[in-house]
Amino acid sequence: MRTSHFAAVVLSALVLVLPLAARAQAPQADVFDRVTHGYAVSEGGVKIHYASLGKGPLVVMIHGFPDFWYTWRHQMAALSERFQVVAIDQRGYNLSDQPKGVENYDLRLLVGDVAAVVRHLKADRATIVGHDWGGVVAWQTALAMPQMVERLIILNLPHPNGLLRELRSNPEQIKNSEYARNFQQKPPTDPTVFFGMPMTPQTLSGWVRDPVARARYVEAFGKSDFEAMLNYYKRNYPRASGADLPATPEPPKIAMPVLMFHGLNDQALHSDGLSGTWKWLEKDLTLVTVPGAGHFVQQDAADLVTSTMQWWLAMRVPK
């Protein structure tokens, strides 16, 4: 990591967070059998499944690729002591509807799915949490519907400006994004589409370390649509890079407080994309970089992520 990019990070936040993380341990009780399940109806009648735990101000959590609502199990268990924590299955995954056609995975519709869940739960505003593609959706929800997003938490997904900048100018990020080109160009039936392997429930869940959790992932991916998973890339991910990537209008500044985590061993999204994030925000940024954690930082560093979320939200949500 190029540490010179991060001189402006709010170090005082880390001074407060790290002692807390050392003391706190994420609850060990699994949430799989404790959550209640429901569905919100989005545009076109698409049903979005969610798992809910706890009561209080609403927190909506959005997974990425390849994943499902259960990725947030550690955070849900802890945050549910003060919040209603709702983790969705994005369209195409697990128990949510899986409409055919790449056009049905446009970012506008993915944002609409989040809004449908918030409205279904009769809330005006929520803390929105997103990882990977869920981070893309979370950023865009904050931009398109700022009145609905009270606070924003992003895991391993740079601000859109930072990601586009790196795709234009950073050879490492351009190389790291070759997998996305593969997803855009190949069908899910190609035997090499998934990092040289076929897409199966087993290969897609190979990154999950805990054997009990992995079995649940295999089951969830067995219910998912692999073509839908790739449609996120085919519809929304830039098809060009380097000098060929066209300029895009700069979006407005993010209007709410932001907490970001980034596992520094991420092989897909370079940490250089974080540099300058504060220039694109109106309010405070707390940035937590996590050495030793990879792309799935919410699981690789579950205790740190969970305790930091608790601390950060406690500072901003009245009791």
Which stretches of residues belong to each language-model region?
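Catalytic histidine-centered segment of alpha/beta-hydrolase-like enzymes
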Residues: 293-302, 306
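Flexible "cap/lid" subdomain of the alpha/beta-hydrolase fold that forms the substrate-access gate
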Residues: 26-38, 46-48, 53, 58, ...
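Serine-hydrolase catalytic-loop signature spanning alpha/beta hydrolases and amidase-signature enzymes
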Residues: 66-74, 85
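A short, Lys/Arg-enriched amphipathic alpha-helix followed by its capping loop at the start of a domain
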Residues: 75-83, 120
